[in-house]
Amino acid sequence: RKQALAALASVASGKDVEKLAFLASPAGKDEFAQYITQPHRSLLEVMEDFPSAVPDLGLFFGAIAPRLAPRFYSISSSPAADANTVTATVAVVKEKVATGRVHEGVASTFLQRAAEGQKIPVFVRTSTFRLPENPEAPVIMIGPGTGFAPFRGFLQERTAQKASGATLGPAMLFFGCRNESKDFIYEDEMQAALREGVITSLDVAFSRDGPKKVYVQDKIIEKASTVYPIVKGTVGKNEGAVFICGDAKNMAKDVNKALLSVLMREGDYAAHEAEEILRRLKAGFRYHQDVW
């Protein structure tokens, strides 16, 4: 954070003062990105690069050391399956950065190393990312990678509904990952849900297994004729709902484009008309996103 660099500059000497102050200033925006943001340079590495900056403990903890922000994870289970258990599906962050350091995610690594029986501080936020009240309402679930997390809970919920005698509406599940052999998490549970009629279709995109990269948005377009009536609300007793979970930067935007393409292709809508349909879906709480 620039605030931390400014604080370090206040206790530095020589050329370190000028350099740190510049990095913390609006004029040093590009240099900050090159030095801090892009290589994921850690606070320890910064302090090693500027050895004259030696803060006392008060300044260090008050203005320099970053306060850890809470991490938000989607619950990947349903109380209908086990009222005493809550699960989370977390990708462990571990990558080598430009400085040569192996960067490990603070929260994901903590969870990975947690011992059985260890207490972990958590809190639960109220969410609108939930199945329609009517089990006959058709749904489309789109969640590559750990974006499948909430849909695992959805499948457990629909399994319990089916077991209680409820009639289930159509449910399409789109999942994606890089490699089938390495990244197809919960494959057995997805296939079981398909066999048992908990979902009506399962489409999986593997982006690294073939000569051409295939993503969930490609699978959505392939299934345009089935996706279209659910998005339009012309199938089932209730209007359909779309659920998207995962990457906000690329995936969610690409899925939105794919749905627009489906509406234009199958419904012969102009672009602005298709956009208005999706806008109404969002306004009517039929287009849900849990993205990061």
Please describe what each predicted stretch is:
Residues 1-292:
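FNR-like FAD-binding dehydrogenase module
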